[in-house]
């Protein structure tokens, strides 16, 4: 006797797909960037690939799938040809994707007929990558969109088989631009195609007027820094509630459930200690050996856990950058949380972070990094940092691709200095490929372009709220362009 009878499976399928019985699923009207990107690929029949939405928990991936179902229905797609599966459901975790599909075809929609598969939390299905490969290769009538919140270490044959078969659409936390939209706030009156790099050609009066356009969103930027880019917390004005949601539904769920179920982690206490250690030292250079000693474990254990946290979309890793042909002798990485609000929630830091210069600097640096990573994603860049051991000069973030090198330094203080002795200028003097460099500041009065004698690179001091907003807006424009002209990177 089978553990699950067909009627047990069918009951779950009907529960997840209300449109089969002429009911509707309640979905919010706000569409994230990932919805627009994935829907373009879903409806383009010339692209024979699946779409994979990848990002942290609670950023709206499930909502995007239900919004896609709603869009399909509005276009006249037969309701029973749309199948949504939440693969972390207790019943569906007992099945392979093939078994769920078999019941769907036997009872709901015939095999061979066109269908749309919306697969949520696909990492919970055994060998999901091989199942998707087979479906994409041998079932051309199926259009597939999947989501995942954690990236398992894949076998070499699995990685090879995935190449060219699905398009990865990143789904990080909300950008500041999206944060304003989801809160239905008025957006600054600025050109939709304005990018940060365009500001190097603008006059000081233009920049002064631009800064004035952003005055009305300063309080929203502070709220964004405090509660982060998660849709549920963005819509709440209760800070304590927001932080509890982040601790319980994002951090604890990943550390105590996903890490056990997906990665087989047994010593959860060690992993939790490491995560708190990273919260306390966010943005600092991490010595694995020192960290292991302080936490009472081995360097190998710490290295393994760091990789898992990165795979679970909880941290960003920045490696040290080479410059001037000099190799980095001590390969020590920097780690940031993927959203500054996670740190606030875990360490119980409330509105006081907005008035503490040291705390606020870490929060701003994390937010700037999130926007840089998302904006440059399509170029598959290397995101690094630079520090010169002899002089202790440093640059917080360097984005590198074959076409550009962009150094970014965060100095969120009242009187940020920028001269030839500053780490940002020293780095630009060593790397002739740099054309533009940014210093992210606090005050509008600092907004402007600076030239330093003897350097070809130009420098832009730009307030953090303006920089992050323009990066988020430009990210939307890039994905719209990608949908028309080229595909994003493939896994």
Regions found by a protein language model. Give the residues of each.
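Domain-level recognition of nuclease-like catalytic cores that cleave nucleotide substrates
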Residues: 203, 444-491
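A short, basic N-terminal segment
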Residues: 1-47, 488-491
